[in-house]
């Protein structure tokens, strides 16, 4: 059995990790930490875990840190800035690290410090950390000691653009114009479990709003992901605008592009179907069908629809996922499976919840 620890088990992604790993046939959760709930059983705080896990929360003290070094893998479901303080000692002990925060997502130290407004305490490890999007970096993840789990918005954006960028790489002519617009909507769980006036029921229900209009910290992550895929001379300008919608979990991103004359000759439906034919967690919808967020609820699946309008020279890609699963905890488990040479679907092969 793989000995796993979860640091920060009281947030929504932490709860999802407990749920997923408790059902994983090759994993044992041997340590669960929380500064605020140390000494309390997890199923006392979250009744949904009754009969699933009775593990007791530990404080993140010196004794716990020593125990972490005895595990095979440590998941950090913590605020930004926590994993970087522990990762070096853990990797030196041979422990694999999967960070669900942003400490190891951005390769650029200056970009991280600009967008997250804190100094990175482990810059050397940042250079070797792998961006944990299996559909893009599977081979590198398999060899990684540290994986930076992607943000929820970048997961939809990068996977929604990947077939287009790869098709562009094979062409001498530009297929889409330089400007890409990503219009994204997330359920309120994406903002976390902490108390917030903006997330109060009376504030967020029956309401729909844009936020971080002047610039969201997931933008450089999206730009980095596109740049890593792109090996042609064509560059793109990305406009990313997130919105908060009155639902608990779920995410929908609409990606809008303008086709060139050469791009209008491409059958983009076929391109997407061929690109993701072997990916078990990505479902390309048949032409004319479009996914909704409920169709992926509580699952690790991501559904994509493609609409090509040659008359208006427009290409629209619609992507949906559960922001807490494929957008967070499920993807972390998928990364763990890759890191340990397991089938990627292990512990994740379950149907979405409907209704």
From Swiss-Prot:
InterPro entries: AGPR_AS, AGPR_type-1, NAD(P)-bd_dom_sf, NAGSA_dehydrogenase, Semialdehyde_DH_NAD-bd. Signal peptide: none annotated. One of its GO terms (cellular component) is cytoplasm. Keywords: Amino-acid biosynthesis, Arginine biosynthesis, Cytoplasm, NADP, Oxidoreductase. Its main location: cytoplasm. It is found in: Cytoplasm. CDD domains: AGPR_1_C, AGPR_1_N. SMART domains: Semialdhyde_dh. Pathway: Amino-acid biosynthesis; L-arginine biosynthesis; N(2)-acetyl-L-ornithine from L-glutamate: step 3/4. Its EC number is 1.2.1.38. One of its GO terms (biological process) is L-arginine biosynthetic process. It catalyses: N-acetyl-L-glutamate 5-semialdehyde + phosphate + NADP(+) = N-acetyl-L-glutamyl 5-phosphate + NADPH + H(+). The active site is at 152. It comes from the Bacteria. GO terms for molecular function: N-acetyl-gamma-glutamyl-phosphate reductase activity; NAD binding; NADP+ binding. Belongs to the NAGSA dehydrogenase family. Type 1 subfamily. Catalyzes the NADPH-dependent reduction of N-acetyl-5-glutamyl phosphate to yield N-acetyl-L-glutamate 5-semialdehyde. This is N-acetyl-gamma-glutamyl-phosphate reductase. It comes from Psychrobacter cryohalolentis (strain ATCC BAA-1226 / DSM 17306 / VKM B-2378 / K5).
């Amino acid at each position: 059995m793989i000995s796993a620890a979860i640091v920060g088990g009281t947030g929504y992604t932490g709860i999802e990790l407990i749920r997923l790993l408790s059902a994983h046939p090759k994993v044992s959760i041997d340590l669960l930490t929380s500064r605020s709930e140390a000494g309390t059983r997890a199923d006392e705080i979250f009744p949904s875990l009754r009969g699933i896990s009775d593990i007791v929360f530990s404080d993140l003290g010196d004794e716990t840190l020593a125990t972490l070094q005895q595990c095979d893998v440590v998941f950090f479901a913590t605020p930004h800035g926590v994993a970087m303080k522990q990762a070096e000692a853990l990797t030196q002990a041979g422990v694999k690290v999967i960070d669900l925060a942003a400490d190891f997502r951005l390769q650029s130290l200056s970009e991280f410090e600009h967008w997250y407004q804190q100094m990175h305490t482990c810059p050397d490890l940042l250079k070797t950390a792998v961006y944990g999007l299996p559909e893009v970096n599977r081979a590198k993840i398999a060899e990684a000691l540290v994986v930076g789990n992607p943000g929820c918005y970048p997961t939809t954006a990068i996977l929604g653009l990947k077939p287009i960028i790869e098709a562009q790489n094979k062409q001498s002519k530009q297929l889409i114009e330089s400007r890409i617009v990503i219009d994204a909507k997330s359920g309120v769980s994406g903002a976390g479990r902490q108390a917030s006036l903006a997330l109060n029921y009376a504030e967020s229900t029956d309401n729909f709003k844009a936020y971080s209009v002047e610039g969201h910290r997931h933008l450089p992550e999206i730009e980095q992901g596109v740049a890593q895929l792109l090996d042609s001379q064509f560059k793109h300008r990305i406009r990313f605008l997130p919105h908060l919608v009155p639902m608990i979990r779920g995410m929908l991103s609409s990606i809008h592009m303008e086709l060139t004359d050469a791009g209008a000759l491409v059958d983009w439906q076929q391109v997407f179907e061929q690109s993701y034919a072997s990916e078990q967690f990505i479902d390309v919808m048949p032409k004319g069908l479009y996914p909704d967020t409920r169709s992926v609820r509580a699952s690790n699946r991501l559904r994509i629809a493609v609409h090509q309008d040659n008359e208006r020279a427009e290409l629209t890609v619609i992507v949906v996922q559960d922001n807490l699963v494929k957008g967070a905890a499920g993807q972390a488990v998928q990364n763990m499976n890759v890191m340990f040479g397991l089938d990627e679907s292990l512990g994740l092969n379950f149907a979405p919840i409907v209704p």
